[in-house]
Structures are given as structure tokens and as C-alpha cells.
Amino acid sequence: MCALAVPFDFTPVDPCENSYVAIGRVRYNDAVPMPTLLIVDDDATVRGMLYDLFSDRYECNTASSADEAFQYMEVEHYDAIITDIAMPGITGVELLKRVQLRDEATPVILISGKGSEHDNQSLLALGAFAYVTKPFSLDEIEQVVERAVTGK
């Protein structure tokens, strides 16, 4: 008889919730690891909605602040990051800049409740993969994340 032990690092998905995910591991019995997605928003409702939308196709972690996101990034590489721009403390734009210093190939999708075409152009010039204004449709954000992860 042969036994196989697989270590799992369980980390809270959201400090507001009492749920956990295995970071960087194969989920369920899938033979191929799921793409990883980090969702950063100080609004628990938006965070939860995005987690619910993507968690069946992506290994998702959520963070309520950029500082918390940095902690996740210390132990995990993400295939894409979605972040709100207007957060207390470190903004989503600053998060984008720090992600680029670490790994400029990681696509960062910025979301905001306020925006203009000028904002869109300037944020893309800073290196954002995309800029999506709230309210956005679920189809729209799904398509943007899919393009970010697949590179298409």
C-alpha cells in the first residue's frame, strides 16, 4: 500500500468570512491547476460578488486592502489581479506600480466607481491591463479577466 501526502497551506479568503482556500494547489481532483486571481477591494460586497463570479474557474483570494494583497503576493504568484482604485491607505494605482516592480508580466485590472476616458488612457499608460468603471456588467469583467489570464 502506498500513501501520498500533499501539504496544503490554508489561508483565509476574506477576513470578514470564516472560509479558507488552498493556495497554489490543485483544487478538488483536477489534474491541472486552476489559474490564480487576486481580488482587492475595500468593499466587502464587491469582493464577495467577484469571488462568487470567478471562484468556479479560478483559484481566488480576496484582500480588503493593498497591504493585505502584498501579504498574499509574498507567498503566491497570481495570473491576474483585480483591484479597486479608491481604497483607504495604499491606492489601487500604487498597488499597480508595486506589482509592476515585482513582475511586470502580471496583468492588473483596475476598477473604479468614477472614471473618464482620460483616466482610462493614463492608467493604461501606467501599465494597467484594463480599466473598468463601476457599475460593470458581469460579462464585461469576465471577458476582461479571461483576456488577462489567457493573454488573448
Predicted regions and their residues:
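Alpha4 helix (beta4-alpha4-beta5 surface) of REC/receiver domains from two-component response regulators
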Residues: 94, 115-130, 143
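Receiver (REC) domain active-site loop signature in two-component systems and cognate sites
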Residues: 87
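Acidic catalytic/metal-coordinating carboxylates
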Residues: 65-68, 91-94
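C-terminal output helix
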Residues: 136-146
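Two-component/phosphorelay signaling modules centered on CheY-like receiver
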Residues: 44-61
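Conserved phosphotransfer cores of two-component systems
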Residues: 58, 74-76, 98-105, 126
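Active-site beta3 strand of CheY-like receiver
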Residues: 76-82
